[in-house]
Amino acid sequence: MVSTATKIATFAFNNCLMNAAGVYCMTKEELLAIEASEAGSFVTKTGTLAPRQGNPEPRYADTALGSINSMGLPNHGYQYYLDIVTEMQKDQASKHHFLSVVGMSAEETETILKAIQASDYQGLVELNLSCPNVPGKPQLAYDFEATDQLLKKIFSYYTKPLGIKLPPYFDIVHFDQAAAIFNQYPLAFANCVNSIGNGLVIDDEQVVIKPKNGFGGIGGDYIKPTALANVHAFYQRLNSSIQIIGTGGVKTGRDAFEHILCGAAMVQIGTALHQEGPAIFKRITKELQDIMAEKGYQTLDDFRGQLQYKP
């Protein structure tokens, strides 16, 4: 029997597919729909210290090859999502979950994480170091010194399982520099990648979204090659205890297969989930299982990270 089960840290999941933060996870109702689907888990909307309305609309648009968005982290506040996942973990039949959070400053991030540390929540936290769509707030993970300082502070008190959501990197030197920092800390996972920041999509003679004069994060088909490169680069460089989550351009079982082949232990779906809804998890799981069966693979470990190079 072909299995798409996987593990992150000590947490077992019956399927490697899940949503990406920001997509189909704003409300409790949306999260419950993911929970009831074929997905192995869900990640919440990135929760900030206080609720946020986000950027003015229109702030999302589908395109022929994916999507562009400048949402600006709209959310109900981290406490809303913390309450949901803490309550759900009381049910032994519940899946394990990921709580996505970030502050608008390093101080706010620490306030949030200290509250989670003191809470009853025992699941995974995904620290979002990579949102490209908050005006005036740079993507922290591109500042290696600031990232190192923040992680050093966090792990001086935070003892629960925590991973990081990364922006795409484009230079081999940056893969090396980032990995050297991440390997110093007991991270549970690294999620590669968030949307490619500050793309521009034009319809006739006008931009298609309002914030930032049309600049926004690019997702979908556009970013799969970049996502695969980041997944494989960090799979090669990070400690084996730091699992990789692959995100970007996944709309078929073949796409998920390629992420796993590059080293991903789990695969998140964003743009295609937004377009198709939670039923997508059943379809992509079946497509992935069919590929595995055709190739004679019984588990993800049979091919995870086994990308072949030209001789």
UniProtKB/Swiss-Prot annotation:
NCBIfam families: PRK02506.1 (NF002702). One of its GO terms (molecular function) is dihydroorotate dehydrogenase (fumarate) activity. Homodimer. InterPro entries: Aldolase_TIM, DHO_dehydrogenase, DHOD_1A, Dihydroorotate_DH_1, Dihydroorotate_DH_1_2, Dihydroorotate_DH_cat, Dihydroorotate_DH_CS. It is found in: Cytoplasm. Its cofactor is FMN. Its main location: cytoplasm. Keywords: Cytoplasm, Flavoprotein, FMN, Oxidoreductase, Pyrimidine biosynthesis. Belongs to the dihydroorotate dehydrogenase family. Type 1 subfamily. It comes from the Bacteria. It catalyses: (S)-dihydroorotate + fumarate = orotate + succinate. The keyword Disulfide bond does not apply. Its EC number is 1.3.98.1. The gene is pyrD. Pathway: Pyrimidine metabolism; UMP biosynthesis via de novo pathway. This is Putative dihydroorotate dehydrogenase A (fumarate). Gene3D superfamilies: Aldolase class I. Pfam families: DHO_dh. Substrate binds at residues 45, 69-73, 128, 194-195. One of its GO terms (cellular component) is cytoplasm.
